[in-house]
Amino acid sequence: MGLKAWSRVKSPWIMFAPCGGCNGCHIEIVACLTPRYDVERLGIKITGSPRQADILVVAGHVSKQITKALKRIYEQIPDPKVVVAVGSCALTGGVFYGEGDYVSYGLGGPVNKIIPVDVYVPGCPPKPEAIIHGIALAIQKLKEKV
Amino acid sequence: MVNLRVLVEAFKSLARCVTIKYPFGPPAYTPEGMRGKPEFDMEKCVGCGGCFNCCPPEAITIMEEDGKRRIEINLGKCLYCATCQEVCPEDAITLTSKFELAVYDLSQAKETVEVSQVKCENCGCYFAPEPQISKVRDRVLSKINPVQKETIEKDFQVYSKYCPTCRKQLSFKLNYHPRKYY
Amino acid sequence: MSFSYENLKEKIVSRLRENLGEDYLGEYEGREGRLYVNVRSGTIKLIAEMLKNEFDARLVTISVNDFGFKGFEVLYHYAFDYKDKVFTKNLTLTVKTLIPRENPEIDSITSIYYSAVYAEREMSELNGITFKGLIDPRHFVLPYEWPHEVEGVEVKKIVDFAPEEQRKKVGKWIPLPVDIEGKPELSIVPIGPFHPAFVEAWYYRLKVDGEKIIEADLKTGFNHRGIMKLMEKRSYWRNIYISERVCGICSHTHTSAYCRTVEMLGNIELPDRGRYIRTFIKELERIHSHLLWAGVGMDLIGYKTAFMWFWRDREHVLDIFEMVSGNRVLHAMNIIGGVRRDITRDMIPKIERKLDIVERAAKNYVKMATTEPLIRKRTVGVGVLTKDEAKEVGVVGPTARASDVGIDVRKDDPYLAYGETSWDMVTRPDGDVYAKVIVRLLEVLQSISICRQCLDLLKTVGGPIQAEVPREFPEGEEAIGRVEAPRGELAYYIRSNGTHIPDRVRIRTPSFLNNPSTLYMLRNQTIADAPIIIASVDPCIACTDRSIKIVLEDVKEKKVKPVSFSMLAEKSRLKSRRM
């Protein structure tokens, strides 16, 4: 591994895109930064700009009004990039999907209908330790792509 | 001017560290009764479908093919609410304390159990899961009057080979009428 | 206005009879002393003025029932809690009128009650009702492709079933008109939908002159899930899991409000242990929500160290949740008629040890907030909401209590164990961001004392934790349940139709009323103060964007639901089978 690749893998920068939903997954993701779970000791930093990110974390069901914004953010992140989907609503629509023939009209679809996803983290909501485990798998994938 | 409160808190955290060492050590707090991944007990499941009826987001599906009934939990849709654990009559589902469920491929996130079914000798249809029939027989025989036990056991062996429609059609041939037990 | 609360019902009924004369059609009493009144639709504005001027009423919400070819029934719910009183059951008045289906028009009351703006915008978009004189008739929540692309079905196929006038076309959201031509020093600053300072997605447009804000405009609707429509397809018991996921921070409050309303429908009484456990979890949730909000607020000021301290001490509360219910967030403890899990004897000493740690930390934070110069400089005198403005906009919860308006559902309409424990309501007269911080931190201390009293009661009382519940509820019953969430008053309205599926569920969350008040508070402040002002009302956008039911029925015996073609076919088969 060259120097560039080693530095990318050892300190990945994460962009967090909250796409609606009930906020349960959002507070568990922000709790990863607090003193008990402290991901900054592993070299991870949260940025606000997609141009500076390596990993995109998406949580929440994606409503129809927000699909365009999510696609634009995905296209602005430079390669190589990894997408992580967190929580039941992001994987399959969760409890808002409806049953039988009926699909709720406010749903833009689970995340993998809109952008390609690499790692899936199930849970409702998943514990912060489970999210850290998911991000560790994402870093493994980033190593292969670099 | 240095803030005194910040200094005091800093010294307190040096003395006793709050951060856990998770990927390189044990997780923070897993009490019993925690709701993690649901798991099936293969020996106890009778394939009744009670969990399928009560699941709020419809994450449990039942498929029947080749004489086997397969029950599947889609872990991507599951809410981890423990209703199936409360409803199951045989205590075959328990929610363990496993929470590391991340996968690369969504079709791998599921939990299955398979139960074989009994085939009717007359018409060839699959009419009931086999563990249900054997458990019902054991429970009835353990609570019944010992005088009638032998006759009932013999009858059970004959009747459990036919589905309910065929049993009615062949009732004369099989000597199948309830009054003979009075 | 000086009057006593003793004969309030009789006074209201007699005044309504005098003023309306023939247009007054009758009244009846519902569960727990709620009063329902039937009137003709032309008198709505007159009733609103009379209630505001003579009785000092407060509008709770507006909801609509759809009865098919009989027409729409519009309901206005009022509460009377601006006066000081002791523990008495408070009155909730509901005014019902019927409007015809061919011409659904009714007067708007936004000129009298500003808090009706959001409710009327939602009704006009989702049911097709025209409110004459609505202040702000713009697009609210639906997706932009409605109704042209509904599940991929072309509109031409559905138009046979419903007349074209009834389907309101939803255009794009247009911001308020801005006249900046000729004034080159003014400009527009948009914030959102994705912004690193906010955890949710919403969109503010600020009209600024240099650094000073002149006007603000808000667009929500990015989080619309169609929850109220989902709830009308599942049984009463399964809806608990949907109402739990309306908001993740106040999830137990939503399920308690839903269960309280359904228990009122069926006249079910909770056993003692069930009540105390429910109250205990509710107060713990209030502590966790206020500590979360305080941390986020400190982060927006720039005091990141305090953000870490608040969230570190919040972890002890989440540990108690995990021990008692099995999950840190979204603990599914409620069920109709009681709770699911019990608190055993060996859990109680561990819980009390953790509560001691949280109490010591909370007292420390109150001292810090009153003496720390950074917090005082950024929050004192910033974003002031006066008492008259608070009453006019109709805010609820700690936002109102920080402006000297003393309303709290736990005191006005006591439920669960709040009548049996002793605690105080906290108010402050200033109305700025500093007052809101102090009110919330002092409420944490009050909640800890309620929790300790509940644990003492649990040590002595035995018995079951659930009551017997019927599967179906009688036809034509309706109920309104009100509950105090960490952000304010939460109201559910449920109507039953004799089966195991509810007919209509209407949710009105506190953020519905609190969010428009930021537009008042943002005037004449600087851009740098905008995030902390917006965050001071504790906005929970997940609670603001749900939906209601849309049923278009034609007079020619064909039922229509404009969401899926297979549902149309199924409904028309059902209806012809019933006829």
Language-model-derived ranges and their functions:
Chain A
Residues M1-V146:
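Iron-sulfur-associated redox domains of electron-transfer enzymes in respiratory
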